[in-house]
From Swiss-Prot:
GTP binds at residues 223-228, 242-248, 267-270. GO terms for biological process: tRNA methylation; tRNA wobble uridine modification. Transmembrane segments: none annotated. This is tRNA modification GTPase MnmE. Its cofactor is K(+). Belongs to the TRAFAC class TrmE-Era-EngA-EngB-Septin-like GTPase superfamily. TrmE GTPase family. The keyword Metal-binding applies. It comes from Roseobacter denitrificans (strain ATCC 33942 / OCh 114) (Erythrobacter sp. (strain OCh 114)).
């Protein structure tokens, strides 16, 4: 295994930058520029020197001995002053060592996976934590990073292995008198796992939305005040406003952190019958995007006909209430009236949905669990048909186990790993 190094903190000027080495020669390489290393898992200040003996910087140095490190290998970290010049010079000094090379994107984390320090779901949790912008995203990523999904998968896997073992034992002793009927226990195990997996699958949509952001479509007729409201919510001129109906033709998006929840407001084209071909295309897009959104806010009077059928949680508000003297209900993008109440209602709706979120956070997780459910359904069907179909039951159970194992990376999937790690920076 090569020894690799990279900048482990953000690129650019900073108070402190972290440079990480990992691999069998990490300690030897580090000693060439800092002299003696501190004891494992302890820190010490060292002077870093180039090959010609010139001083590069003073650094805080930490050393970790395998397997007690992030990667499971020997690791050394240099915490240097965050000057671009200092970082570049340290990296150049490390490059001068023939036994070390610059790490590829995500290579440190990949080594942690290969050495059993993380499972695949934890790797994805780490990536999500790095990308987290809101509190809900951070909490969700931490749950996965700390191994909660992997622990749940292991419980499912253990139960299915027990069920498969019972079936296999019955097959092996088919010609002998087996005193115990395994069907009740196997049935109970399959029902337990199937129920848990279905619950987890049901929560994946919300989990994926926490990662990408809940979408809220502003829907209404032309000149209903949608763009003005969007600009008020954004605190800037995100959309063009005009007294001319049909100004908005493309869907305009504004992302926000709403009480820790990631949301995206969509300003859609005004809905009406139009002879303008370009506007008609915009209206068709608006209807499609609004129907796909997680929530719709209809800006329309109580007697107006809606071109999109509202769903249970959708919100309907009278727009431009600033033009109706004495009105206490509705909303105004111009004055801000009704906006706090709207945001609280939206936050309440999504908070209730988030309460049902599971641990599976990626589409890959959902697809793997759906495959496992199909295999479990097939195995249960074969089980009920009697002992002569136990070989099919065992085969389907093994398929279900393999599907669940892909969640945590027990099954080799080189292309999948390449895709996941390509999203990491060099220092991870």
């Amino acid at each position: 295994m090569d020894t690799v190094f990279a900048l482990g903190s953000a690129q650019g000027r900073a108070g402190v930058s972290v440079i990480r080495l990992s691999g069998p020669a990490a300690w030897a390489v580090a000693e060439t520029i800092c002299g003696s290393l501190p004891d494992p898992r302890k820190s010490a200040v060292r002077v870093l020197r180039a090959q010609d003996g010139s001083v590069i910087d003073q650094a805080l140095v930490l050393a970790f001995k395998a397997p007690h490190s992030f990667t499971g290998e020997d690791v050394v970290e240099f915490h240097v002053h965050g000057s671009i010049a200092v970082v570049r010079t340290v990296l150049d000094a490390l490059s001068d060592q023939d036994v070390a090379r610059l790490a590829e994107a995500g290579e440190f984390t990949r080594r942690a996976l290969e050495n059993g320090k993380l499972d695949l779901s934890q790797v994805e949790g780490l990536a999500d934590l790095i990308d987290a912008e809101t509190e809900a995203q951070r909490r969700q990523a931490v749950r996965v990073l700390t191994g909660a999904l992997g622990e749940k998968v292991e419980v499912w896997r253990s139960k299915l292995i027990r069920a498969a073992a019972l079936i296999e034992a019955t097959i092996d002793f088919a010609d002998e008198d087996v005193p115990v009927d395994v069907t009740p226990e196997v049935t109970s195990l399959l029902e337990d796992v199937s129920s848990d997996v279905r619950t987890e699958v049901a929560g994946t949509h919300v989990a994926e939305r926490i990662r990408s952001g809940f979408e809220i479509a502003l829907v209404g007729a032309p000149n209903a005040g949608k763009s003005t409201l969007l600009n008020k919510l954004a605190g800037r001129d995100a959309a063009i406003t005009s007294e001319i109906a049909g100004t908005t033709r493309d869907v305009i998006e504004v992302r926000m952190d709403l009480g820790g929840l990631p949301v995206t407001f969509l300003d859609t084209a005004g809905l009406r019958q139009s002879a303008d071909e370009i506007e008609t295309i915009g209206i068709e897009r608006a209807i499609k995007r609004a129907q796909e959104a997680d929530l719709r806010v209809f800006l329309s009077g109580p007697d107006e006909r809606l071109l999109i059928e509202p769903l249970e949680d959708d919100i309907r508000l009278t727009p431009k209430v600033d033009l109706a003297p004495g009105s206490q209900t509705g909303i105004s993008g111009k004055t801000g009236q009704g906006i706090p109440e709207l945001l609280e209602k939206i936050r309440s709706v999504f908070s209730e949905r988030v309460s049902a979120v599971g641990l599976a956070t990626h589409e890959r997780h959902r697809l793997a669990m759906q495959r496992a459910l199909e295999d479990l359904d097939n195995s249960f069907e074969a089980l009920l048909r009697g002992p002569e179909f136990y070989d099919i039951t065992a085969q389907e159970l093994r398929s279900a186990i393999r599907a669940l194992e892909t969640l945590v990376g027990r099954i080799d999937a080189e292309n999948l790993l390449d895709e996941i790690f390509s999203s990491f920076c060099l220092g991870k």
